[in-house]
Amino acid sequence: LGDVYKRQENNCIEAINNNVFGTAVVVEMCEKYGAERFMMVSTDKAVNPTNVMGATKRMCEMIVQSASINGKVKYSATRFGNVLGSAGSVIPLFKRQIQNGGPITLTDKRIIRYFMTIPEASQLVLESGVIAHNGELLVLDMGKPIKILDLAENMIHLSGANNIKIVETGLRPGEKLYEELLVKTEELDKTENDLIFREKDKPLPTEAIREKLRMLKDVCENGDDEQAREMLRKVVPTFKRPEEVNQEVGEEVEPEDNSLPQRKRKD
């Protein structure tokens, strides 16, 4: 995921073409060929995004929700965070760095992230597709956020190689200290599953989405990545500069403990 994030941050037009226009094309094809259901898997980076990946994913959510107004297909989107052990996640990276004798590299020791296991993610995404109503944006309860520094220290301790150093490399462009997933609890409705919530987010009219897509298409055709990034800020109003969000978060957000979240599942 880190490599994908970095590539998209450095290639804004490519990210817009792939994520935004790619989603629009898939929605169009679903309508054309009579698909029954369309479920988008989104990310916590779409909440008040500070990077290109998050902003394009937020635009994708808006496209999917808007399509539900007049479309024949049942549309929904599900948002969740990092998956432990998946390709590109920090655990395989830290494991390799420990095996190589270190150091473990962190962009910032204050970074906090949500995690779930691959089985948890698979189960909840599939279930959210079943319970979602047309046009809904669902949010998964990822449990308590985990401090990446604690995760690194625990992995070093478990490996028995206590001489491994941890080195800060500095935040990457667009990187947040803390990913917002559940937004505000008062903005969420419960579902049949205690771990899945509905966000109270009204879809934009079809014409508004078409205008946003037109604006993005025009600027992308010019071939200027910075102009495309600025246009992305216009069409995704919640797209913030990372320094704004990181300054707000600062030292305020601390997980209650450094253990992995334990969740109770419904039978």
How should these model regions be labeled?
Residues D3, K45, L84:
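Glycine-rich nucleotide phosphate-binding loop and flanking beta-alpha elements
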